[in-house]
């Protein structure tokens, strides 16, 4: 679940649905959000696909040090990727134009990623994604973007 100011997007699935629902792992979400942060250091517009939905995107528009976050609907064209830099005719979704400072967005993602690494390490030292996500966190913390 993503929360920006008081607006929320996404679902937190109950544990009993884990075996029957095909869903994107938290690692994948964190990896994609890390790429959004990196791209926002270079570009003013980044759209992150909600790969679990038909046509929903999380849109990030950066102006100076502020990022405006919106949920938008736009067709996922053939050959599109999980992150795009231009959407064709996006339409406002559940909420829009929530403003957050770029530094705060970056800090929040790093903190939540750290909490996730700590949680899965404590809960299950055999978790297959622990090493990958720990490397992602360390790399993210080293980068100055």
Task: Give the predicted meaning of each segment.
Residues 2-7, 70-78:
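Secondary-structure transition/turn motif
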Residues 31, 65-68, 103, 107:
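Generic structural signal for well-ordered, non-transmembrane alpha-helical segments
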């Amino acid at each position: 679940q993503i929360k920006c100011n008081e607006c929320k997007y996404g679902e937190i699935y109950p544990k009993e649905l884990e075996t029957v629902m095909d869903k994107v792992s938290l690692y994948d979400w964190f990896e994609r959000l890390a790429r959004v942060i990196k791209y926002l250091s270079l570009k003013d517009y980044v759209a992150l696909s909600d790969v679990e939905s038909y046509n929903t995107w999380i849109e990030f528009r950066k102006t100076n040090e502020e990022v405006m976050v919106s949920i938008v609907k736009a067709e996922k064209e053939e050959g599109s990727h999980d992150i795009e830099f231009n959407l064709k005719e996006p339409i406002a979704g559940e909420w829009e134009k929530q403003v957050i400072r770029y530094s705060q967005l970056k800090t929040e993602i790093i903190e939540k990623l750290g909490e996730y690494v700590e949680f899965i390490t404590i809960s299950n030292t055999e978790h297959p994604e622990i090493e990958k996500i720990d490397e992602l966190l360390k790399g993210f913390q080293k980068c100055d973007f």
